[in-house]
């Protein structure tokens, strides 16, 4: 029998946090697979762009088209495959938030902030649709993390990665 006075089973640790993130990711992928929603106008436009890849489009950067082209190449042209990169990127955003929070604060705070991010209603909705904001937010988080590493380290790799992540935000 577990003595709850001695051990807090609800205390977060890194393994529980990442297991929770993985569980949320699986639920989001299942939700996309079973979603009755058709593509929004923007999603359909991005899918159209993915059929004619270019270095840029009139109103948006090209990364969203490249993402959709990669997922539809591997999984076929379906609504769920067009949206598949959204939960993947949101999982990566959560991981980056964990690393940023750990870098600024500590592991306990990082676990808590990451779980808050992963369970926000807007985050949950945003991970079910594909938009230009999803990769932008990931690369913004990567830029913040690499900036923190650049400021605390003399290694040349961090400024290079900072430049790459800022460039990918565009």
Regions found by a protein language model. Give the residues of each.
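Extracytoplasmic catalytic/substrate-binding loops of multi-pass membrane glycan-assembly enzymes
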Residues: 34-46, 55-67, 76-80
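Membrane-interface alpha helices of multi-pass inner-membrane proteins
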Residues: 52, 158-170
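Membrane-interface transmembrane helices that cradle and orient dolichyl/undecaprenyl
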Residues: 102-107, 143-158
């Amino acid at each position: 029998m577990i003595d709850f006075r001695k051990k807090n089973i609800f205390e977060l640790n890194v393994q529980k946090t990442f297991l929770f993130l993985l569980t949320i990711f699986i639920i989001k992928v299942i939700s996309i697979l079973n979603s009755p929603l058709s593509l929004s106008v923007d999603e359909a436009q991005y899918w159209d762009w993915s059929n004619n890849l270019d270095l840029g489009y009139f109103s948006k950067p090209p990364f969203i088209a490249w993402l959709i082209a990669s997922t539809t190449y591997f999984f076929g042209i379906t609504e769920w495959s067009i949206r598949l990169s959204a939960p993947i990127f949101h999982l990566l955003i959560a991981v980056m938030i964990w690393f940023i929070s750990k870098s600024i604060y500590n592991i306990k705070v990082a676990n808590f902030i990451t779980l808050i991010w992963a369970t926000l209603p807007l985050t949950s909705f945003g991970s079910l649709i594909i938009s230009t904001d999803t990769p932008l937010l990931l690369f913004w988080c990567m830029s913040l993390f690499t900036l923190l590493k650049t400021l605390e380290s003399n290694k040349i790799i961090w400024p290079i990665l900072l430049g790459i992540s800022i460039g990918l935000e565009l």
